[in-house]
A protein has these predicted regions:
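Short, solvent-exposed loop/turn segments at the edges of secondary structure
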Residues: 22-25, 67-70, 78-83, 102-103, ...
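Low-complexity, intrinsically disordered Gly/Pro/Thr-rich segments
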Residues: 237-244
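An aromatic/glycine/proline-enriched structural segment found at the starts
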Residues: 28-94, 201, 256-264
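M16 family metallopeptidases and their MPP-like homologs
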Residues: 1-4, 26-32, 82-95, 122-233, ...
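Phosphate-proximal small/polar/acidic motifs at interfaces that engage nucleotide phosphates
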Residues: 62, 121-122
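Active/ligand-binding-proximal structured segments within catalytic/core domains
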Residues: 86, 97-112, 122
Length: 264
């Protein structure tokens, strides 16, 4: 949130918010592990059964305009280095009419920024020496619409500017629009993404969080069982189609982040 919103809030505002939303009807209790169901039910009733139920307001999905038009901003923040952030309005699993596109965006994020062998670090950082670091991220499990984000820090030792970094990021996106990844690159990225999910499921805590997160945003925990099949179904053509649909100026927000000392 924004600091000016927090500064305007009162204790009464916070209590009303808490009373409105923090109730059993708006909670998800997840228990994972080697437990006896009957014993768990007894413990749940003992520790949570006395909490009174309250009506819960209908929660609306936070939807965004598909193509709000190109937006640009410059922010002067407490940071040592400049940064370029480029975001695109995209749907999530909750709001998409084509879930294959969402899984394609997941793989695009991994293809661009998923590790040292990904395109942004390999091409922009090591080959072209334009950036000191670059990353991408996308949350497919948002309660409403989501953002596909790219960020990069220019190589100031080489005198690279934010405008040059911005142009380089767009070139990487346009490369996906013009030419789909070859099968070998897609399989490598897919294997890395699935492997990271498999390792994460070794953690009981991570399992509980994943189940709770899906149910809380309105998706089924059973998506975990079909997730790998969904990723495996994505083709190079799906990657190209998603890049063409979503990575457009009309969906984009560009932010130049500069140190406060650079303010004119």
């Amino acid at each position: 949130g924004w600091m000016h919103d927090l500064e305007r809030m009162t204790i009464t505002d916070l209590r009303q918010w808490h009373d409105r939303w923090y109730s059993p009807g708006n909670a998800t209790l997840v228990i994972v592990g080697d437990v006896e169901p009957d014993n768990v039910k007894t413990l749940v009733k003992r520790h949570f059964g006395n909490i009174p139920a309250r009506p819960v307001p209908e929660a609306r999905l936070p939807l965004e305009l598909n193509e709000p038009g190109e937006r640009r901003s410059t922010q002067y923040l407490k940071t040592r280095l400049p940064m370029l952030m480029l975001g695109f309005n995209v749907p999530a699993l909750n709001t998409s009419d084509n879930v294959t596109e969402i899984h394609a965006l997941r793989l695009i994020s991994a293809l661009l920024g998923g590790g040292e062998s990904a395109r942004l670090p390999a091409r922009l950082e090591r080959q072209q020496e334009l950036v000191a670091g670059a990353s991408s991220w996308f949350n497919p499990f948002a309660r409403g619409d989501s953002l596909f984000m790219l960020s990069a820090t220019p190589n100031i030792q080489k005198g690279i500017t934010l405008d040059q970094v911005e142009q380089a990021l767009w070139q990487q996106l346009q490369a996906l629009q013009e030419t789909p990844p070859d099968a070998a690159e897609l399989e490598r990225v897919r294997a890395q993404l699935i492997a990271s999910e498999v390792y994460a499921r070794d953690s009981i805590t991570r399992q509980a969080r994943s189940i709770g997160m899906l149910e809380t945003v309105g998706l089924s925990w059973r998506l975990l069982d079909s997730d790998f099949d969904s990723l495996n179904a994505v083709t190079p053509a799906d990657i190209q189609a998603a890049a063409r649909r979503f990575f457009t100026p009309q969906r984009s927000t560009t932010m130049h982040v500069l140190p406060e000392e650079a303010r004119p």
